[in-house]
Amino acid sequence: MRVSSRHRQWLSGIALPLFAGAVVLAACAPSKSDPPVMLTIAQLQDPNSCLPCHADAFREWAGSMHAYASEDPVFVAMNKRMQRETNGQAGTLCVGCHAPLAVRLGKTKDGLNLAELPAAMKGVTCFFCHATDAVEGTHNNPLRLATDGIMRGGITDPVKAPHRAAYSSLHDRESHDSATMCGACHDVVTLPGAHVERTFDEWNASLYAKPGQLACGKCHMDGRDGQAAAVAGAPVRRVHDHSMPAVDIALTPFSGADAQRAGIQKLLDATLLTKLCVKQAATGVVAEVTLDNAFAGHKFPSGAAQDRRAWLELVAYRGGAQVFASGVVADKQAVTSIVDPNLWVLRDKTFDAADKETHLFWQAARVESELLSAAATADPQDPAFFHSVTRTFALPLPAPDRVTMRVRMRPLDFDLLDDLVSTQDLDPGVLDRVPTYELGGSNREWTNAGGFRCVE
């Protein structure tokens, strides 16, 4: 598989400046009594400096959407168009999360010059996360960076290393404090005041934010036993995956894309519980479909839900012939473009100041949401315990002999992408790489062999 030129740099130890590389490699294998060779702040800001001691975490991160954040062609296209349409007034709204270190160091003010910057300034880097020592707000990246050279993490007793290290609850996936750090960028409010991305807010309102429940990293950074660093005296302990899959995937050749896709599919397959009931009703035969966001720690879908689409595909057959269909969408066809009065699509709609629907998020002044809520309580006596959604579909007579359903999803849909292509902000070749996922756990099939009943 081809990888981008930037990630050939990330994944090659020889991309380190020769002197810096020698320093780090020497520092990774001292005796227990040797004083470590300390890295400078400038060296710590370069992810390549992390590779010799943290090879596994580095390679996972290098194939992550965090590393890809400023290279993503849709981000580049939307940021370019946003800056043009707002005459630069949007400033760091996008790049503040997609290349935050470059913003903090004054290397960019709007993200339009990212292609000219060194790789160490691009994406969400190791230093940016591990130098964070406080969260000073709830959205649009209010993280505070320390300048003391201490790399913070979730290990309470770090060993000697080429940098100073300290425990931080913000970096401990067992601590709910860590969710506030993730939420700093995974909640976005536009200049007109619309809360367009609400993943942290959704988690905060869910069962998972309660004491003893799960922070973001428990799902998105799987744990395993291993060494956190290849330094003398480093014990085997619980470490976690830095590939951080969710639903977005690289749309250009990129290192680790296959692993990223597999991680996404694993999460999606374990998100929903579904039920398909085919019944005889007073009005005829109906299909009742229930979708339950049982296991995501936020709504489904989440994040940039004005651009995401998840939808139900429901098809009925009689004698092998299709007699009813809803949600059957062709490749590269926008879900909302199909004529389908029964379409069940999960998404946000955004509206500008004139109350006109827009898919350009920076114009958004308000949001209408139709997403599946996360679990809010584990108490079956609490009315909020029941949060699934059921819809009923009238089926044609005579009754079908087979009915199938599945839930499909796109991280971005083609109404937005086609628009970006039409303004020449996005290369049309990117559209061929946009995935359509199928949630494996959502597939259900009813046949008349067992009579009218529910399948779950």
Predicted feature descriptions by range:
Residues 100-108:
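Conserved, well-structured interaction surfaces
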Residues 95-100, 130:
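Outer-membrane beta-barrel channel domains
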Residues 29-31:
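Bacterial signal peptide processing site
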Residues 91:
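Aromatic-lined, polymer-binding surfaces characteristic
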Residues 2-18:
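Bacterial N-terminal signal peptides that target proteins for export
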Residues 33-41, 57-85, 108-399, 404-456:
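Primarily the internal scaffold of c-type cytochrome electron-transfer domains
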Residues 25-27:
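C-terminal motif of bacterial Sec signal peptides marking the signal peptidase cleavage site
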